[in-house]
Amino acid sequence: MSEKTIKVTLVKSVIGTKQSHRATVRGLGLRRTNHCVELQDTPEIRGMVNKVSYLLKCEG
């Protein structure tokens, strides 16, 4: 059985954002602009993505 995943890409820089938002982006495993990661689709990850959605592009 395959786990559901979501593909998250950082499309805007974290410069000038709140410290907590920068920490959330790092917690998602994103390091630089246009960096993409695949993450498990869990409520915790969805909450983190929702918090910094203005910086991200999400697929899946």
Swiss-Prot record:
One of its GO terms (biological process) is translation. Keywords: Ribonucleoprotein, Ribosomal protein. Part of the 50S ribosomal subunit. The keyword Ribosomal protein applies. Signal peptide: none annotated. GO terms for molecular function: structural constituent of ribosome. This is Large ribosomal subunit protein uL30. Belongs to the universal ribosomal protein uL30 family. One of its GO terms (cellular component) is cytosolic large ribosomal subunit. It comes from the Bacteria. InterPro entries: Ribo_uL30_ferredoxin-like_sf (IPR036919), Ribosomal_uL30_bac-type (IPR005996), Ribosomal_uL30_ferredoxin-like (IPR016082).
